[in-house]
Amino acid sequence: YLLHYQREATGEVIERSVNARGLFRRIAETNWDYAEPGALFWDRIEGWNLLTNTEEFSYAGVNPCAEEPLPAGGSCLLGSINLSEFVQNPFTDHAEFDFEGLKRCVDVSVRALNEVLEEGLPLHPLQEQRESVAKWRQIGLGIMGLADCLIKLGLTYGEEDAVEMCDNIGFAMADSAIAASAMLAKEKGPFDACNTEEIMSTPYFAANTSEKTKELVRKYGLRNSQLLTIAPTGTLSTMMGISGGIEPVYANYYERKTESLHGTDVYYKVYTKIVESYMKQHGLKSDAELPDYFVTAMTLDYRQRIDMQSVWQTHIDASISSTVNVPNRFTVEETENLYMYAYEKGLKGITIFRDGCRRIGILNTSEKKEAKKLSAGEGLKRGEILLVTDDVVGKKRKLTTGCGSLHCIALFDPHTGALLETYLSKGSTGGCNNFMVGLSRMISISARGGIDIETIVDQLNSSGSCPSY
């Protein structure tokens, strides 16, 4: 297969011939090992939205989480609705979803996001951004709490009845959002580049609007060229104690460790909020008594997980940021199959995270404990520091920085390979050198205190550094 890329600035054409199947295998192997790269299916991104037939419009890329494809100068403006709050009579045989309440919420939310867009329009730093936002007026209304919603309804995530419920909720959300944007267009005018005929001729519009909404758009146009997206909502959902985005519950519980000054660690089982609520309401003593519809990311078949995202993508004109969490035993071949199934089901993008892979995840289970990290001082009590002898092996590097040469020495245990000490020196005096000496001492004492090198590196990477480095 011939890869082709043209640099707009210079007109330079870059081409490279690759073995497509071999490249796909390499992508799957890398993802299995490190949870990157994710996949974007660009034909689906361009072919399933409100601007498919608008020739002057083109996507320049996506935001980092990939749920919001944007043109050059586009702005990411998102908001999410908690679906679990629309379940009436939760955890009972009479539980039902409040569709009318959702429609009212969507109408208010679309208006609210448009108000935020107006407020922020003059604040964008670049003229290109201000012009793009004014011309296309893209917003991204999404959802969170889906897994909690299904549990309250007594539906099993990924099963046929849950997929059907999501299909109904998704259509109601899309139809209501488009209608709300049309009513805003009536009040304040459509977005600058709005071409009603082109919008109404798109497959996405035809599949997601009622006759009443079609008539509103035909009459008034739309205030926004893009309306719906689904973000991961990791911080929002954690703050609210609900499931994130369209994700299943990651685990029914996690273990919390309390450390004492006497070298004794105590572990507590902490239940996910939705699990805790159900157990209290039904008087359960253990999660083993939970009904079968309490599935988790690690017990769910990945095809069911893809099926859920597929039905939601049918109703989302932007995209969906979503991670398929798979167990540690997941193979490279299964990773390939997952990518292919995602494409076949019409997804715009997908990310795969194998529990226990080399990349440290935000959420983890205990299954990966078999992949032990290298650390010095196995069995140290809390507060103990390992003494280092001369029996070490070392590596020396000289790095060139914006402030001159930096001399680096790392010493390791010759038997285990664990880091023991580091020495950093600028070879000069002054505050920069003093900082490097202090940093190397802190790295050394952390390593000799039993902290593995991956954790040390992760902490330092997250803190940033002087731009000259």
Q: Where in the sequence are the language-model features?
A:
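Conserved, charged catalytic cores of large soluble enzymes
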Residues: 1-57, 80, 88-93, 143-213
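Short acidic-hydrophobic surface loop/beta-edge motif
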Residues: 1-6, 228, 392-401
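Function-dense linear segments that define catalytic or interfacial modules
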Residues: 31-133, 143-153, 242, 247-282, ...
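Catalytic alpha/beta core of large soluble enzyme barrels
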Residues: 60, 66-69, 113, 117-121, ...
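Internal maturation/activation junctions in enzymes
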Residues: 105-130, 134, 156-233, 320-321, ...
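Glycine-rich phosphate/pyrophosphate-binding loops
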Residues: 153-159, 320-322, 346-359, 448-463
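Short, Gly/Pro- and small/polar-rich lid/capping loops
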Residues: 211-219, 364-405
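C-terminal binding/interaction regions
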Residues: 463-469
